[in-house]
Swiss-Prot record:
Keywords on record: Ribonucleoprotein, Ribosomal protein, RNA-binding, rRNA-binding
Protein name: Large ribosomal subunit protein uL14
Any one annotated GO CC term: cytosolic large ribosomal subunit
MF GO annotations: large ribosomal subunit rRNA binding; structural constituent of ribosome
Organism: Nitratiruptor sp. (strain SB155-2)
Assembly mode: Part of the 50S ribosomal subunit. Forms a cluster with proteins L3 and L19. In the 70S ribosome, L14 and L19 interact and together make contacts with the 16S rRNA in bridges B5 and B8.
Length: 122
């Protein structure tokens, strides 16, 4: 459950380390984002030689949340942190590597490039 002003770790090598959610995309009064949802975010912490800079506004897809996700088979899955992957204008990841596990719900939202780069899909 990601909403405005939520801080998320960045799970790729785009150069950003932490982002803060500004808006949840999809719907005019949409409040929460879960795994697989796209958000607009501001970069709060970044590496000096990265592709994105501090203060830059980016789009990102949520790949892990602390709030549990209910699957269709009744099982629940939750992660230790809130994490996202930064996207470009064509909804492709900016980074070339993904760190940490990624939820299977990302595949259902057609982010296949993220799923193929991820070391583990849970």
């Amino acid at each position: 459950m990601i909403q405005s002003f939520t801080r998320l770790n960045v799970a790729d090598n785009s150069g950003a380390k932490e982002i803060m959610a500004i808006k949840v995309l999809g719907g005019s009064k949409r409040r929460y984002a879960s795994v697989g949802d796209v958000i607009v975010a501001s970069v709060k912490k970044a590496l000096p030689n990265g592709k994105v800079k501090k203060g830059q506004v980016v789009k990102a897809v949520v790949v892990r949340t602390k709030k549990e996700i209910q699957r269709e088979n009744g099982s629940l899955i939750r992660f230790d942190d809130n994490a996202a992957v930064i996207l470009d204008n064509k909804n492709e990841p900016i980074g070339t590597r993904i760190f940490g596990p990624v939820a299977r719900e990302v595949r259902y939202k057609n982010f296949m490039k993220i799923v193929s780069l991820a070391p583990e899909v849970l």
